[in-house]
Amino acid sequence: MIIAQYTRARLVQYGFYARIEGIEFDPRNGVRFCFRMRQEQIRDWGRENLSGRQYGDLKAALRVADVAIQACVANGKVDVSKSVFPARGCVDIKANDAVAKVATQVREQLGLLLPLLEADCHRLYEAGQNVHGTREIALGDVRVTLTEEPCGDFDFGWSPQPGDTLDDLLGGGRYLNLRIRVFRAGRLIAEKVRKGVVDTGNSPHYGGIGRALLREAITINAA
C-alpha cells in the first residue's frame, strides 16, 4: 500500500524521483520514508525548478509525510526528531498505528466490494445490456462507482450482440472511457480512467479489467 502514490507519481512525472526515493505505507510494517535530501533542500529545489502547480504538489507530498509521521509519534510508536529527512538513507517507522488501521479497513472493504461489482456487471452482460451511465456499490463508509463514458463510434451498420466474437466486431463498434472512483466517508480517495476501450456489449470491461483498474487505483491517503 502506498500512502503517497498519487503525489509520488506526480513527482516521477516531473523528474523529481531521482531526488526522492519515495514515501511508502504498508499496513503490516508501518511507514517508510526514503529521501536523499533534507526537507528544506527539497523545498528549495522545487521552488527553483518546478512550476507553481508542480511545487504545490511537492509541498503536498511533504505534508503527507509530516501527517503520517505525526500520527506515529502521537501513538508513541516511534521517537522522531525534527530532522526526519536525512541527507542520505531513510527513516523507518514500524507501527500498527491509527493510519495503518484506517488503510487496512478500507482495503478489507474493497476486497468485499470488488467481486460484488464484477458480479453486478456480469448480470448486465447476461441480460444483453451495458452499464449505460454509472453503477454504484457500497459497504460501510466505502463506496465504489463505475462510469461508462461513450467517447466515439465507428459504424458498421448493426449493433453488437452478446456472444459476438472479436471477428464479428472487426467492422466497427463503440469506444468507451471507463472511470472508476473510490470514496471513503464521501471523500474521493482513488480514481482511475481507461480510455478508448472497445465496447462489445458483453466483454468483461467492468469486471476483470475494472477490478484490475480498481486495484491499481487504490491510492489512499489514510492520514
Regions found by a protein language model. Name each.
Residues 1-223:
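Acidic interaction surfaces
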